[in-house]
Amino acid sequence: FLPFIAGMAANFLPKIFCAISKKC
């Protein structure tokens, strides 16, 4: 369960950071 959540976070966090910081 935790590796799945870690994978989701690793997938979503860069996209969220990209959208917020406008650094892609």
Swiss-Prot record:
Asked if the keyword Metal-binding belongs to this entry, the reply reads no
Paired cysteines (S-S):
18-24
Tissue/organ expression:
Expressed by the skin glands.
Compartments where found: Secreted
UniProt-listed GO biological process terms: defense response to bacterium
Which keywords label this protein? Amphibian defense peptide, Antibiotic, Antimicrobial, Disulfide bond, Secreted
GO cellular component terms given for this protein? extracellular region
Q: What does this protein do?
A: Antibacterial activity against Gram-positive bacterium S.aureus and Gram-negative bacterium E.coli.
Family of the protein in this entry: Belongs to the frog skin active peptide (FSAP) family. Brevinin subfamily.
Name of the protein described by the UniProt record: Brevinin-1Bf
What is the native source organism of this protein?
A: Lithobates berlandieri (Rio Grande leopard frog)
